[in-house]
Design a protein with these regions (language model features):
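Active-site substrate-recognition loop segments, prototypically the cytochrome P450 B′-helix/B-C loop
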Residues: 1-6, 18
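Conserved polymerase palm-domain catalytic core
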Residues: 10-178
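Active-site and adjacent loop segments of nucleotide-processing enzymes
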Residues: 178, 182-187
Length: 187
């Protein structure tokens, strides 16, 4: 709770996962708003492969260092990231990812993925993100295809994440868009 207020005010407004006062219902409502009111009815549904297990430690530290200057806090963060996992009866070092179930892990993921959120916002793309569930909403198929190319390039090249090409797709909301277990239609 000490670190969260440093980042929270500047997170992208369409980021909903693991944030105070926000929920999956809010994320669904925002997606419906973009589709129904603003006619952003071409939707990229992005799937990231093992997102939380593949967060790059150096990039995490770099993003935290932009706001936190206390070296002891950054050192603790690095120790947390590299604390390892139990496999059977022995401890294995972790070179990537954020420990599952860690108290600060959701914040780490949001800080990490906020770079993507802000990148897309700066280019005029409308997104809704709940943790690693990402929708990009566009007014045309060509716009959605462009957004997918831009997003995939940034996620893979800059954030070192993997977009699951077989599970990522573009759909029109007339056909329904599944998001957080709910199917959203144009009307």
């Amino acid at each position: 709770r000490i670190i969260e207020p440093i980042f929270e005010p500047d997170f992208h407004p369409s980021s909903y996962g693991y944030r105070p006062g926000r929920s999956g219902h809010h994320a669904i409502g925002k997606a419906e708003l973009f589709i129904r009111r603003y006619r952003r009815d071409w939707v990229v549904d992005m799937d990231l492969s093992k997102c939380f297990d593949t967060l790059n430690h150096d990039l995490i530290i770099r993003q935290f260092r932009q706001r936190i200057t206390d070296g002891s806090v950054l050192s603790l963060l690095r120790q947390f990231l590299e604390s390892g996992v139990m496999v059977g009866f022995h401890l294995e070092e972790t070179e990537l990812g954020s420990p599952q179930g860690g108290v600060i892990s959701p914040l780490i993921a949001n800080v990490y993925l906020d770079a993507f959120d802000q990148f897309m916002k700066a280019r005029g793309h409308r997104i809704v993100r709940y943790a690693d569930d990402i929708l990009i909403l566009s007014g045309s198929r060509a716009g959605a295809e462009n957004a997918l190319r831009v997003a995939q390039s940034y996620l893979e090249d800059e954030l070192k994440l993997t977009v699951n090409a077989t599970k990522t797709h573009i759909a029109h909301s007339d056909d329904g868009v599944k998001f957080l277990g709910v199917v959203i239609h144009t009307k």
